[in-house]
Amino acid sequence: MSVELWQQCVELLRDELPAQQFNTWIRPLQVEAEGDELRVYAPNRFVLDWVNEKYLGRLLELLGEHGNGLAPALSLLIGSRRSSAPRAAPNAPVSAAVAATMAQQTQQAAQVVVPSEPIVVPVAEPVLSEVEEPSSRDSFDSMSDSGSVPAASGRTEQRTVQVEGALKHTSYLNRTFTFETFVEGKSNQLARAAAWQVADNPKHGYNPLFLYGGVGLGKTHLMHAVGNHLLKKNPNAKVVYLHSERFVADMVKALQLNAINEFKRFYRSVDALLIDDIQFFARKERSQEEFFHTFNALLEGGQQVILTSDRYPKEIEGLEERLKSRFGWGLTVAVEPPELETRVAILMKKADQAKVELPHDAAFFIAQRIRSNVRELEGALKRVIAHSHFMGRDITIELIRESLKDLLALQDKLVSVDNIQRTVAEYYKIKISDLLSKRRSRSVARPRQVAMALSKELTNHSLPEIGDMFGGRDHTTVLHACRKINELKESDADIREDYKNLLRTLTT
């Protein structure tokens, strides 16, 4: 059984699965041929069990179909093809929230063919959460004396750690970024559950935890939430949060001070290392070399590592393959843009924190039109609140239109029915004229319904106007299309993924 056949079947499976499922469960797998047997290595026990339960059956079907009908001999192991022997399966507890979320996101179950040990499932503490990202602060400075820095007042907590009498570390955690202030929705549910598992069981969770996604989606908030929870459980813990560029600057400073050994000892002595925007290590060879050894030392010592990036680790250009491989040893989770309901919840919670009365229809109006990320959503709300305060008026949809007129005009310009039709046609590889035609074949009718539903959600056009722009159709046809797509989004994983991808493309 060749490795090439496995890779061919994995590519076929990629086409069948939503991108997040493929990246989380299939992409981290490594494979090697041992005679007529294929050995498939998972980075940890949880990935192994999940692949075994949900995807192995389909993989075996594909291997049989494309391997001349021969049933393959296949073994699932924990470890890496580069290691001399597979690692023993750890007894890591899996949070109920994580398990429940995984089950929701996986649509097709496969036959279980490899026995696995039972998993202990503790009940995770129910928490409501919210999304925001602060800037990182200085972390590693030369010392002229042995005095420590007092805790800063306000939102940010400053902690100082003395190292070898020559260096100090000041780690800043935003105390408002907790699990309680994080608004949870479908888009971030898995990431939040995994972060909670790490925070509550740092010695038995996922290591490293790698969160990736666009800007302003809550990756940094979750990272701070973990750090704050660890310090709440153990105030003496050494929890270090910093931006990747700060790590580079610290290393350069240590080299200039001839203090590289102290630098190494410090970073390898922390209980938890939280590094934001790991993609900035790209093409910095010396920094990658130092971080590689720091990362290995921390994992070998059982210390927790949490990383974030704006993209999937394998897609970070200029990052060494050995680092990408190690990032896959733990759990890699995407943080998606928030869906409409979550955006409304974020706005209502922010307004409540600001002690401002925000009518639900006003929150819905803002959430419908500001879709790219939470940071822009909160910025829009601040403008509305300021406008309301200065004008001495209650917040209404009319006031929102006045205060956000430039943003709304830009949004209307970027998202037009013409643009939606063009994007949907390209996505489904059909012609725009097909969308406007009277053809009723499934290959055309379904994309047309998707385009109509997107037009209703993303533009201010009425149903009759949308119908007119789709070949002169009646408004009842548009209404039927919108209802049909909403139903399919609940029952059809492919339609749900298509709609989400198109929505992201049109609003980013």
UniProtKB/Swiss-Prot annotation:
Top-level taxon in the UniProt lineage: Bacteria
Region (Domain III, AAA+ region): 172-388
Record-linked InterPro entries: AAA+_ATPase, Chromosome_initiator_DnaA, Chromosome_initiator_DnaA-like, Chromosome_initiator_DnaA_CS, DnaA_C, DnaA_dom, DnaA_N_dom, DnaA_N_sf
Signal sequence residues: none
Subunit comment: Oligomerizes as a right-handed, spiral filament on DNA at oriC.
Annotated function: Plays an essential role in the initiation and regulation of chromosomal replication. ATP-DnaA binds to the origin of replication (oriC) to initiate formation of the DNA replication initiation complex once per cell cycle. Binds the DnaA box (a 9 base pair repeat at the origin) and separates the double-stranded (ds)DNA. Forms a right-handed helical filament on oriC DNA; dsDNA binds to the exterior of the filament while single-stranded (ss)DNA is stabiized in the filament's interior.
Protein name, per record: Chromosomal replication initiator protein DnaA
Disordered: annotated span: 130-160
Record keywords: ATP-binding, Cytoplasm, DNA replication, DNA-binding, Lipid-binding, Nucleotide-binding
Domain notes: Domain I is involved in oligomerization and binding regulators, domain II is flexibile and of varying length in different bacteria, domain III forms the AAA+ region, while domain IV binds dsDNA.
